[in-house]
Amino acid sequence: MKAVTEVAESGKKILVISDDAYFGLFYEDETEKESLFTYLCDAHENILAVKGDAATKEEMVWGFRIGFVTYGGKAFDKKALDALEKKTLGAVRCTVSNCDRPGQSLLLHAMRDGKHYEDDKKYLFDTMNERYTIMKKAVERHSESAVLKAYPFNSGYFMAFDTTGHSAEELRLHLLEKYSIGAINIMGRTLRLAFCSVEKDKIDDLVDTVYRGAEELWN
């Protein structure tokens, strides 16, 4: 925040986009529970803050592909924000239009009228929290590995490894072909795993196998 504000104070006009797609999925007490968007909105007149949210993640409706965009800025009055909203609506109509209307309608109905909506959401959060905790402990057991280094993680659905100069795509293919494990290669040097889709009793074995696969390739 300090760095962004200092640049804004120098006279630069800044657009800052806050990716809040996983907002609310915080598993550690010390994790910041407020979005940077909140602070950016009131930080400086030269800052336009944009927040992207995703019901797909935050409401745990995987596959619905529902997103939201919110604008804020200290220098923007209602007239300016209304104009920006109309421009955004025009862009949406000219591109994706209302292609996800069924998903939007289903989610809205559940949020308004679902008798067990909050209870179901809490149950799913607790499930993700438990998987996260097991995943974190499993990764910590391999902290001395020279071939994979886990990036810090404390929220959301995923975690990732730095492949320490080796090819993440090579490891991805090796894990898929030999162990039927699916992972994502990010820019050739990062391998992402989704603990959200793994049963808790299989997470330890998953992590052990990923490290084993890396050792087979690079040691």
Please provide the spans of the model-predicted regions.
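Conserved core segment of the aminotransferase class I/II
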Residues: 41-126
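Conserved glycine-rich beta-strand-loop-beta hairpin in the small C-terminal domain of fold type I
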Residues: 101, 108, 121-136, 147-162, ...
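PLP-dependent enzyme catalytic core of the Aspartate aminotransferase-like
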Residues: 45, 173-219
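Generic structural signal for small/hydrophobic residues in well-ordered secondary structure
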Residues: 19, 67, 107, 128, ...
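Amphipathic alpha-helical segments that form well-ordered structural scaffolds
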Residues: 3, 106, 134-138, 174, ...
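Short, solvent-exposed loop/turn segments at secondary-structure junctions
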Residues: 22-24, 55-59, 74-76, 112, ...
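Active-site pre-lysine segment of PLP-dependent enzymes
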Residues: 1-64, 68, 77
